[in-house]
Amino acid sequence: MSSPSGKTALVTGASRGIGRASAIALARMGAQVLVHYSTGEGEARAVVAEISKAGGRADTVSADFSAPDGAHKLAKQVRAIVGDRLDVLVANAGISKSATIEETTVEDFDRLFAVNVRAPFFLVQQLLPILGKGSSIVLVSSLAANAAVGTLAAYAATKGAIATLVKHFASDLGERGVRVNAVAPGAIATDLSSFTKTDAGRDFTLSVQALKRLGQPDDVGDVVAFLASNEARWINGDTVRVDGGSKL
C-alpha cells in the first residue's frame, strides 16, 4: 500500500503506543505526519527523528486535550503547517482510569470524557475546513466498549461514545467525500494497558485469545494506516476489531 504518499496526516497521542505505531506506519507509506503529544515532548521528538531517519517527513505539534480549548489550539497549529489540506486524521489520544463504580470521582469521569470524547469531536469540527474530498478520519475505540472489562466502566463508556460518533460522522461527512472509521483494539501491550503488565492479566488475556499472544502497537497501527489508504476506500462508518480473535 502506498496511497497516503504525498499526503498530510495528523496522529494525536503519537508519542508512544498505538499512536506512535500509526504515525510510523503512515510515514512509511509516504505521508507527511504531524506527531501530536501532550506531555511526552521527548518521546514525540524521538518519533519524528525515527521517521526522518527512514527518509520520511514529520513535525511535532502539542496540545492538552483536558483543556476546553485544546482541540482549537491543535487545529491552529496543524493549519499553520499543512495549509488548506489535511488528508488523514487519526484521533488516537486517550487516557484510562481503573476504578470501581464506587471509586470513580466526578473529576475522573469528566477528565475521561474531556480527553477521550470531547477532544476528538471538536478536533474533527475544527479541522473540517481542511478535510476535503478523499480525506479519511480514523478514531480509536476499544473492545471494552462492548464488553464488561474489569474496573473500566467510565473509560469503556467513552469508547462506546467513540463507536457511536463514527456512525454519525460517517453519515454527516459522506457528502463531502470524507470517510470515517474506527479501530477497536483488544488487549495491547502499551503504557495505557496496565492490565497486560500483570501475570494474572496476561494469563487471562491469553486464555481468551485465539492467537495466544498479546497484541502489539504495530498490530493496530498497520490497520489504522490501511483504513486511511485508498485500498479501504469502500469502508466507511465501521469499527474494526483488532484483537487477534478475543472471545470468539
Region locations from a protein language model:
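Conserved glycine-rich cofactor-binding loop
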Residues: 15-16
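Substrate-binding pocket helix/loop in short-chain dehydrogenase/reductase
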Residues: 100-101, 105-113, 205
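Active-site loop immediately N-terminal to the catalytic Tyr-X3-Lys motif
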Residues: 102, 134, 147-153, 175-176, ...
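Active-site helix of classical SDR
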Residues: 124, 158, 166
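Alpha-helical segment proximal to the catalytic Tyr-Lys
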Residues: 129, 171-175, 233
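Residue(s) in the substrate-gating loop at a strand-loop-helix junction
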Residues: 142
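C-terminal helical subdomain
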Residues: 182, 203-235, 244
